[in-house]
């Protein structure tokens, strides 16, 4: 081999090696190994309202929205056009009911930060919450290992609930 063809072959080998390293590093990008959401639900007695914030990994939410919307690709960002999709999804998977009625959930909005999306809701509520059932099946149709943790603050004291596949409804 001539000197110039040897240098060319060496450059190609290095380039191939760098591309291989880049491909491997991007395909093994650090992804979380668990699927969890955390919900804070607080009763504001003077306002007679539940204030709710749900923290979900953004990539998981994007996948859940995609599966609910015929594989459409979603990219969650602040000030995007996805609020109607997020609202519809949350209304389907987060409900508060008793034997007679379903509480009206008001979607306040969402906020994206780093790797998580915060979803904000309010539920006007003037009754005693005991005996009401809260469904939190967010992302359970997408991930079999999804766990949704909820911290509930009532005037009677705090409670914590865990929701998972097969246990998506808890009695308050």
Predicted regions and their residues:
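Bacterial N-terminal signal peptides that target proteins for export
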Residues: 3-17
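N-terminal soluble domains immediately following signal/targeting peptides that reside
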Residues: 30-172
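Bacterial N-terminal signal peptides
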Residues: 16-26
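Intrinsic disorder/low-complexity segments
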Residues: 1-5, 10, 22-23, 26-30
């Amino acid at each position: 081999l001539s000197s110039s063809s040897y240098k060319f072959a060496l450059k190609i080998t290095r380039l191939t090696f760098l591309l291989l390293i880049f491909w491997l590093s991007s395909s093994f990008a650090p992804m979380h190994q668990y699927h969890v959401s955390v919900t804070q639900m607080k009763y504001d007695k003077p306002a007679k309202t539940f204030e709710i914030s749900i923290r979900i990994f953004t990539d998981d939410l994007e996948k859940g929205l995609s599966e609910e919307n015929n594989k459409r690709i979603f990219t969650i960002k602040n000030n995007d056009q996805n609020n109607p999709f997020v609202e519809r999804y949350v209304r389907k998977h987060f409900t508060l009911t008793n034997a007679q009625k379903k509480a009206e959930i008001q979607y306040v909005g969402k906020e994206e930060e780093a790797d998580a999306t915060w979803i904000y809701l309010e539920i006007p509520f003037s009754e005693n919450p005991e005996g009401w059932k809260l469904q939190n099946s967010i992302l359970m149709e997408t991930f079999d290992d999804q766990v949704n943790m909820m911290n509930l603050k009532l005037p009677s004291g705090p409670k914590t609930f865990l929701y998972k596949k097969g246990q998506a409804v808890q009695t308050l």
